[in-house]
Amino acid sequence: MKIGIIGAMEEEVTLLRDKIENRQTITIGGSEIYTGQLHGVDVALLKSGIGKVAAATGATLLLERCQPDVIINTGSAGGLAPTLKVGDIVVSDEARYHDADVTAFGYEYGQLPGCPAGFKADDKLVAAAEDCIKALDLNAVRGLIVSGDAFINGSVALAKIRHNFPQAIAVEMEATAIAHVCHNFKVPFVVVRAISDVADQQSHLSFEEFLAVAARQSTLMVENLVQNLARG
């Protein structure tokens, strides 16, 4: 099995990258892909860059160049579920765009023409992630993760997301684009991120302060998930 791992920022991939053995680097299309073994498992780690276009471009290159069997999207997210605090884990059962609107033509809010309203995460990957959460005794929430090309730190933007997606547990800037590409390539995916802020008016300050905490927690989860998947 080869596992693809995608993070947007240097801070979100550096801890994992440093643990990859026999590491080789592919630089292409504004992305960097690091291949090798993580705990003896073949992996391809992508640093995509921030935002939906960067994430989709990188995910496509990763799938074409490295042909992983599954994709794990890692990194940080803004918490929406009331029980979440900094360092907690969110696991996707679905990903949707919060900034797509073609409702004038009868589509659901967040749905693009020719696409499902949401992109479903793979049940087996979700179950494996929840096994790791239980083993590590982490606080976590599973549910809908929404994505858009905006860092959410104001009451108006937050209220709009809560209105359109009251069930959403977290918000970030890449996951749904990655899920969209995985859907097109028919490759299973799951989003496993750690909370860096709670998407409020102080979220930009919280993000800067707690990104390192989120990176450590998401790295811990991904390492355990990789080993869990390799064991089958």
From Swiss-Prot:
Report keywords, A-Z.
Answer: Amino-acid biosynthesis, Hydrolase, Methionine biosynthesis
Name recorded for this polypeptide? 5'-methylthioadenosine/S-adenosylhomocysteine nucleosidase
Give the binding site residues for substrate: 78, 152, 173-174
Keyword Ubl conjugation in record:
no
| Any Pfam family hit | PNP_UDP_1
What family classification does the UniProt entry report for this protein?
A: Belongs to the PNP/UDP phosphorylase family. MtnN subfamily.
Pathway assignment reads: Amino-acid biosynthesis; L-methionine biosynthesis via salvage pathway; S-methyl-5-thio-alpha-D-ribose 1-phosphate from S-methyl-5'-thioadenosine (hydrolase route): step 1/2
List GO terms (cellular component aspect): cytosol
Query: What is the species of this protein?
Result: Klebsiella pneumoniae (strain 342)
**Reactions catalysed according to its record:** S-adenosyl-L-homocysteine + H2O = S-(5-deoxy-D-ribos-5-yl)-L-homocysteine + adenine; S-methyl-5'-thioadenosine + H2O = 5-(methylsulfanyl)-D-ribose + adenine; 5'-deoxyadenosine + H2O = 5-deoxy-D-ribose + adenine
